[in-house]
Amino acid sequence: MQKNILIIGAGITGCSLAYFLANTGWDVTLLESQDDIASGGSGNPVAAIYPKFMLNDKAYNNFMLKSFMFTTAWIDKLGLNKHDYRFDGAIEILEEAYAHKLEINLSSGSVDQGKILTLIDKSILKKYLMNQDSRGLLFHQGGWVNPIALCRHLVNHSNIKILTNQEIISIEKLNNEWTLKTKDQKVFNSDHVAICNAGYLHQFDLTQHLHTDAFRGQINWVNSTPFQMPSIVICDEGYLAPHMQNKHIFGATYGMNDFNKDIRLSDTKKNIASIKGIHQEFYNYCLVQKIISGRVSWRASTKDRKPYVGRVFNNELFKKMRVRELAQTDQLPWLDNLYVASGFGSRGFTFAPYCTFVLANLINKNLSKEDKESLNYTNPERYRLKKMSLKKAASHIFKV
């Protein structure tokens, strides 16, 4: 039986899903609205990969760690060029009080701290050239990857076809298959469709209720410096990446629903200020540089910071169903063979590989117990069900 799928969006999410499906026998067509793959948020020179925790949310922290551990192990086995990624560690600097609370939170969860992270003090921080009297988390498997190199590697497969400059404006079911139309009236048909276009879910009638906020992020970089720099990713108010591609990259700003595409001097100054606590000498160096390059892109984030990964409802059937019917999860009105993966926020390169691996298992009808637990957690329809006081149904769409 021929298996084919159209994937909208060729950033890290679309490319990862294409990779997993192509390697299980699917013919994949990637439809990208821009001139090339990895042109949006996945097009920065570097992506820092480390978990970002939330206090008092064990479920989120465990899901974050699960994604982080999967992603770093997976990338390490892909066969990327060694100059395109390094997992030598990553440090997040924390205030003393916050670090103590987080340590308690993590120790009471399902985290094997010794293998994954270590809470470190200022004596260790100073070994990494930082001017800190705070504490920090050292993620032993953290690091960075070249996003464009990773995406190109993932789609280098005979089962994957890439079509650029294809802006999809509509999705509808016609004659038992999905029909996609572009802005210039091209038509694509397939039995299966996956929407992986970050913050543009609202473009389509079928997914316009899946709200995300757009966060503008500006990064900056300068040419290699004449003095010693940290050898691993360091995160404080901003982040500083190790030397790569003859540049040092730092950032990033985080502006909600700000759609200015220009590199702004005010944001460059914010990024410089954010690294003062990481490396005083580099901070001083950036203050006097006349040419500091940069890039702007957007991240899509959900209200609860949990991504949308899975299936979506048939809106017409959903509106007709009663609450007691919707409470029966085996009666939920899912659309056949339409999937979404979006809302990863600033943790796209940590979340997306694991989430698309799970989504590929859903598409292949080959779900493990852990996959079902993850899809329960990322259910795209959770808000609509919770709004109807169906909190249990929202997080138990699969029986585990």
Show where each model-derived region lies.
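Extreme N-terminal leader/targeting segments of oxidoreductases
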Residues: 1-5, 23, 397-398
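Active-site substrate-recognition segment that forms the wall
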Residues: 6, 13-24, 33, 41-53, ...
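Conserved beta-strand positions in the Rossmann-like core of class I SAM-dependent methyltransferases
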Residues: 29
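Dinucleotide-binding Rossmann-like beta1-alpha1 core, especially the glycine-rich loop
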Residues: 46-128
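Short beta-strand to alpha-helix junction loop
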Residues: 56-67, 95-99, 137-153, 262-267, ...
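Helical element adjacent to the flavin cofactor pocket in flavoenzyme catalytic cores
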Residues: 137-184, 188, 192, 196-197
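C-terminal catalytic lobe of FAD-dependent flavoproteins
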Residues: 286-400
